[in-house]
Amino acid sequence: MKKILITAGPTNEYIDEVMKITNMSTGRLGVELTKNYLKNGDLVTLIATRSVIRGGLFERYGLSSNPNLKIVPIETTDDMYKALEEEKGSYDLVIHSSAVGDYKPEFSFTMEAMAEELVKLISEGKVSYEDILNTLTNPNCKVNDDTKISSYEPNLTVKLTLTTKLISNLR
């Protein structure tokens, strides 16, 4: 009997409490692998998003009731990183079939608010490359993303940043 760790499906990176950046991964490969290893009598830990765990394929195979399956639900790349850190080291085989997002939202702003902030900066005589770059990368006009952002914001801009790279941390 082997101990297998499998990741499956997409990661979700939230812009606000309802909008997210994700990808088209269904998690099918990870679910199929999980099914086959469980059929062989192996112990499987599956790290996956709710969309995979609650998906029709997962239920059709009756995976949720298998005593040899440990499910670790995650949503974001950071969640997956933490789960992998907690689980790593005690497995015979690790299969990373998850489609992890490359970017996550850092903050949001409206073009109008950014234009006002830049005009103010220029009027104060702060027109150096460093001043402008600092304003663009850390503006005062950030939209509060702790709640739902209004769907009436015509010029909403989302600044993305890189997510944690997981493969190098698995080694």
Q: What spans do the regions from the language model cover?
A:
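A cross-family phosphate/adenosyl-ligand binding-site feature
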Residues: 1-171
